Amino acid sequence: ALPCRCEGKTEYGDKWIFHGGCPNDYGYNDRCFMKPGSVCCYPKYE
């Protein structure tokens, strides 16, 4: 996934395109929506 950063955060997350939310299988517990069609998911998946 591409790196992204939500407003107010210092660390980077994973950007997913064309998802209504974050995929379930990566352990994400936070997110913010970026421009239409992309979402930034935290924490970054290793």
From Swiss-Prot:
Disulfide bonds join C4-C40, C6-C32, C22-C41. GO terms for cellular component: extracellular region; nematocyst. Keywords: Disulfide bond, Ion channel impairing toxin, Nematocyst, Neurotoxin, Potassium channel impairing toxin, Secreted, Toxin, Voltage-gated potassium channel impairing toxin, Voltage-gated sodium channel impairing toxin. It is found in: Secreted; Nematocyst. Gene3D superfamilies: Anthopleurin-A. One of its GO terms (molecular function) is toxin activity. The keyword Transmembrane helix does not apply. Pfam families: Defensin_4. Its main location: secreted. InterPro entries: BDS_K_chnl_tox, Myo_ane_neurotoxin_sf. Belongs to the sea anemone type 3 (BDS) potassium channel toxin family. Neurotoxin that induces paralysis (but not death) to U.thayeri crabs. Partially and reversibly inhibits glutamate-evoked peak currents (IC(50)=4.7 uM) but not voltage-gated potassium channel currents in cultured isolated neurons from the land snail H.aspersa. Weakly inhibits voltage-gated potassium peak currents (IC(50)=6.4 uM) and steady-state currents (IC(50)=8.2 uM) in rat dorsal root ganglion (DRG) neurons. Weakly inhibits voltage-gated sodium currents in rat DRG neurons (IC(50)=0.9 uM). Negative results: has no inhibitory effect on voltage-gated ion channels Kv1.1/KCNA1, Kv1.2/KCNA2, Kv1.3/KCNA3, Kv1.4/KCNA4, Kv1.6/KCNA6, Kv2.1/KCNB1, Kv3.1/KCNC1, Kv4.2/KCND2, Kv10.1/KCNH1/EAG1, Shaker IR (with the inactivation domain removed), Nav1.4/SCN4A, Nav1.5/SCN5A, Nav1.6/SCN8A or D.melanogaster Nav1/para. This is Toxin PhcrTx2. It comes from Phymanthus crucifer.
